Structure formats: structure tokens, C-alpha cells
Amino acid sequence: MTIVLIGPMGSGKSKLGRRIARRLGKPFIDTDKVVVAGHGSIAGIFAEFGEEHFRALERVAVEDALAHDAVVALGGGAILNAETQDDLASRRVALIMVSAEAVVSRIKGSKRPLLTDGVSTWAEILESRRAIYERLATRTWDTSSRPLDAIANEIADWAQNGN
């Protein structure tokens, strides 16, 4: 069974995903890392080819990742693609959220191309995507103040037992 983590930039999807995968004995796939490994930095892709090109590369990475029995962390904007939304309808999807206050230190100095203005841009992006995240999510966790190990244990239990 594929477990998918979605949520805004800086919410902890990658860190949680690695921990959950270890607990479940599954591979971990971070679709942003897959794109970077094959095509260079996300900032570079945005600068040279634009967001639309990046989203096309991301879609290929998502489609491939979802074909595996793995824990998969999607980039924050991957859910904007209608095919990806359709693909997630039949999967266990964990929405990983974080407050604006908690994300400030996580994104400080970030080279993420959509965060040029920091937390205010982050909050705008989150609000523009929130309804999609919530519609796709099977269950939601907040990483603002709880230890990631505790959250990873809960998600692993949920993945195995459905509760």
C-alpha cells in the first residue's frame, strides 16, 4: 500500500516520510528529490524553464512514485495537477500541516523559488491550496509543535491499522 504525504512547503513531509518508511519497512520517495536528481535544482528549473515545465517534470515523478509500494512525499504544489488529484483519490493521503509561526525558522534562507518574500508568500500559497489539500486528505497531522517521531509513529500505525 502506498502512503502519500501532502502539504505546504516546510511542513516536514520529507523528514516524516523517511521516519514512516523506516517504521513500515518500505522505500521512501520524495518527488522533489527525484526531479532534482534527474534535472537539476528546482530553483534552476524555474529560472531557466518556468513553473509550467517544472510541474510537467513533477507530474512524471509523481506518477512513477505512486506506482510503488512506498511512502511518497509530494512537493507542495504537486496537488495542483488534476491527474495527480485523481491518482490520490484511491490512496491513503496524510495531510501534513504547520502554522505560519512554526514554518518561519524552517524556510528562513530557503532557495525555494516560490518563497522569495518569505512567510507572507508561504501563507498566500497555503491558502490558495488549502481546499485541495483538505479534499484529498484521508487524515491530517500538524507538525507545528509536536515531535516528528511521535507523529511518524501515529502515521505508521494509521497506515497499518487504519485508525
Regions flagged by a language model, labelled:
Residues 90-132:
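A glycine- and Lys/Arg-enriched "phosphate-lid" helix/loop adjacent to the NTP-binding pocket
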Residues 76-79, 99-101, 146:
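Short glycine-rich anion-binding loops that position phosphate/pyrophosphate groups of nucleotides
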Residues 39, 58, 66, 107-108, ...:
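Short, flexible helix/strand-to-coil boundary loops that buttress conserved ligand/catalytic motifs
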Residues 15, 19, 23, 120, ...:
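NTP-dependent small-molecule kinase module
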Residues 8:
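P-loop (Walker A) phosphate-binding loop of NTP-binding proteins
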Residues 29-87:
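ATP-dependent small-molecule kinase phosphotransfer cores
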Residues 12:
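Conserved glycine(s) of the Walker
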Residues 5:
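Hydrophobic anchor at the beta1->P-loop junction of P-loop NTPases
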